[in-house]
Swiss-Prot record:
Belongs to the arrestin family. The keyword Phosphoprotein does not apply. This is Arrestin domain-containing protein 1. It comes from the Eukaryota. It comes from Mus musculus. The lineage of its organism: Eukaryota, Metazoa, Chordata, Craniata, Vertebrata.
Length: 434
């Protein structure tokens, strides 16, 4: 064996995740089989972000640095054979962004150590990646506790000469959620035509924007639930739930090259109608509950009033008059409730969460003290990229699992609205899989 038998960095107490402004301490451990002359032993703590225009390409076209500090552990001299430990400590900046890894870029924080040897001798280097979690407090976002509502009216033709309208209104109970929290969705559909609509679909979308020479967008569907269609001349109401899986936080504050957005999209294919609700995913849950509706004020999503046009267009007056009158809204059933569809080759990777026990479903877990960390969106098919890039597994051990449909809690789909209503007088809870 050579002179240097072991050269590695060890962080105190085996820590892997740190917060901005925290001290990072550790030792550089060295085992020598023979005396080693050296000119300097240094350790560097650094954080940076790199973005590429091609998927899974480490040749960054744009980079930015967040911190870069070096310490000299030993000056010129010679180390005898045996074990040697050199302690170090750095103070992480308060503005350091959360670690992240995606197909077009990553935010990496690491410690590097080097032994500078005399001329014509081999230098020695080692490094260790650590992770920073800068918790996003959802309560700092204005109106985060308010219901989220959007509506659209779609006019369409059918049977060559007939026309009709469909009014689609979607709402959620909050505007922001944490991992493991249930997103409550309500969709109200009024079919002002003699033709049945296609099924209504709700999708939780993630959009990651990378700033390279131009903006690159990577969009993926995180979870999806499908309801039935609405019969002709009918009003219908659809209530469902989506469990928020392990996801990186919104925005990534402190980083100007990568931005993360989340949306809930409710849509129908026939007629083509779509509403999109922006959402936030954070680490510290909203500490307020939605307000109950007050008399004379607009109702909450649980009792959202339907949007009805004042009168149909003139050319539809005869059809509306001859058609049946609208009855009370009917409740739509759910055809399928699937968290993200599995990729063709499942990745054997895991997401990092705390050991904090989950509390009742539908209320935030106690993430204020130990919020979960998810640094990666996993392997995805790029929405916009050069070439025909496909899903490629990353090498990171902290990566979002690509499979949600068959995993146990918290990746198991929550119960349907009808199932949850059956447990009257009890808190909302997951039904264990059989």
């Amino acid at each position: 064996m050579g002179r240097v038998q072991l050269f590695e960095i060890r962080l105190s107490q085996g820590r892997v995740v740190y917060g901005p402004g925290e001290p990072l301490a550790g030792t550089v451990h060295l085992r020598l089989g023979a005396p080693l002359p050296f000119r300097a032993i240094r350790v560097t703590c650094m954080g940076s972000c790199g973005v590429s225009t091609k998927a899974n390409d480490g040749a960054w076209v744009v980079e930015e640095s967040y911190f870069n500090s070096s310490l000299s552990l030993a000056d010129k001299g010679s180390l005898p054979a045996g074990e040697h430990n050199f302690p170090f400590q750095f103070l992480l900046p308060a503005t350091a962004p959360t670690s992240f890894e995606g197909p077009f870029g990553k935010i990496v924080h690491q410690v590097r150590a080097s032994i500078d040897t005399p001329r014509f001798s081999k230098d020695h280097k080692c490094s260790l990646v650590f992770y920073i979690l800068s918790p996003l407090n959802l309560n700092s976002i204005p109106d985060i506790e308010q219901p989220n509502v959007a509506s659209t009216t779609k006019k369409f033709s059918y049977k060559l000469v007939k026309t009709g309208n469909v009014v689609l209104t979607a709402s959620t109970d909050l505007r922001g959620y944490v991992v493991g929290q249930v997103l409550r969705l309500q969709a109200d559909i009024e079919n002002q035509s003699g033709k049945d609509t296609s099924p209504v679909v709700a999708s939780l979308l993630q959009k990651v924007s990378y700033k390279a020479k131009r903006w690159i967008y990577d969009v993926r569907t995180i979870a999806e639930v499908e309801g039935t269609g609405v019969k002709a001349w009918r009003r219908a109401q659809w209530q469902e739930q989506i469990l928020v899986p392990a996801l990186p936080q919104s925005a990534l504050p402190g980083c100007s090259l990568i931005h993360i957005d989340y949306y809930l999209q409710v849509s129908m294919k026939a007629p083509e109608a779509t509403v999109t609700l922006p959402l936030f995913v954070g680490n510290i849950a909203v500490n307020q509950t939605p307000l109950s509706p007050c008399p004379g004020r607009e109702s909450s999503p649980g009792t959202l009033s339907l949007v009805v046009p004042s009168a149909p267009p003139q050319e539809e007056a005869e059809a509306v008059a001859s058609g049946p009158h609208f009855s009370d809204p009917v409740s739509l059933s759910t055809k399928s409730h699937s968290q993200q569809q599995p990729l063709s080759a499942p990745l054997g990777s895991v997401s990092v969460t705390t050991t904090e026990p989950w509390v009742q479903v539908g209320s935030p877990a106690r993430h204020s003290l130990h919020p979960p960390l998810c640094i990666s969106i996993g392997a995805t098919v790029p929405y916009f990229a050069e070439g025909s890039a496909g899903p490629v597994p990353t090498t990171s051990a902290l990566i979002l699992p690509p499979e949600y449909s068959s995993w146990g809690y918290p990746y198991e789909a929550p119960p349907s609205y009808e199932q949850s209503c059956g447990a009257a007088g009890t808190d909302l809870g997951l039904i264990p899989g059989s």
